[in-house]
Amino acid sequence: MVDINQIPTRRPFHRRHKTCPFSGANAPKIDYKDVKLLQRYISERGKIVPSRITAVSQKKQRELAKAIKRARFLGLLPYVVK
């Protein structure tokens, strides 16, 4: 029988807490005309990347989604990329 005390224990994985890139003093403003900024939060297929991946706060994620949808409607961003 194997003694439980002899089995090596793993250290728990510690994930670094990310901060929202849109909060702070030098944070960029979310604007539907700033296509270069908005493209960083769209996947290569044209979908909006979720906030758990981009670490954007809930309030700013809603603003970001609204700005992306406005830019799509005006033809600044594509709806889908083939």
Swiss-Prot record:
InterPro entries, alphabetized: Ribosomal_bS18 (IPR001648), Ribosomal_bS18_CS (IPR018275), Ribosomal_bS18_sf (IPR036870)
Q: Keyword check for Iron-sulfur, yes or no.
A: no
Instruction: Give any Pfam family that matches.
Output: Ribosomal_S18
Query: What UniProt keywords apply to this chain's record, in alphabetical order?
Result: Ribonucleoprotein, Ribosomal protein, RNA-binding, rRNA-binding
List GO terms (cellular component aspect).
cytosolic small ribosomal subunit
GO MF annotations, alphabetized: small ribosomal subunit rRNA binding; structural constituent of ribosome
Q: Which domain of life is it from?
A: Bacteria
SUPFAM superfamilies of this UniProt entry?
A: Ribosomal protein S18
The region called Disordered is annotated at 1-20
HAMAP family, alphabetized: Ribosomal_bS18
Recorded family membership: Belongs to the bacterial ribosomal protein bS18 family.
**Chain's role:** Binds as a heterodimer with protein bS6 to the central domain of the 16S rRNA, where it helps stabilize the platform of the 30S subunit.
Q: What is this protein called?
A: Small ribosomal subunit protein bS18
